[in-house]
């Protein structure tokens, strides 16, 4: 993928550069072909990834079960597939 996201029909594939243990859970800037997402959860045994899924579900107005981790359970480099997002953050709209 050239960009940090790619549409596959109604679904959205998203490349993430994760930052666990951050002061604040938030969407950051684009870095290359990844979107920086910081979560306040610690990086241990997939907890930060679970936190990120919950946060992304809120941002895209979908259920957590509508988000599939394609790769990166214990890595800062992750890819998610979001089924039929109901809302898009501004960084994707632009």
Label each region the model flagged.
Residues 1-53, 62-64, 68-74, 78-94:
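Contiguous, often N-terminal, cationic amphipathic patches that form binding interfaces
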Residues 59:
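C-terminal catalytic core of tyrosine-transesterase DNA break-rejoin enzymes
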């Amino acid at each position: 993928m050239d960009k940090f996201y790619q549409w596959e029909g109604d679904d959205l594939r998203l490349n993430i550069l994760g930052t666990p243990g951050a002061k604040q859970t938030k969407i950051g800037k684009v870095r290359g072909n990844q979107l920086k997402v910081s979560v306040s959860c610690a990086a241990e045994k997939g907890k930060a990834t679970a936190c990120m899924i919950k946060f992304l579900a809120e941002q895209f107005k979908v259920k957590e079960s509508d988000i599939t981790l394609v790769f990166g359970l214990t890595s800062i480099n992750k890819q998610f597939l979001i089924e039929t997002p109901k809302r898009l953050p501004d960084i994707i709209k632009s």
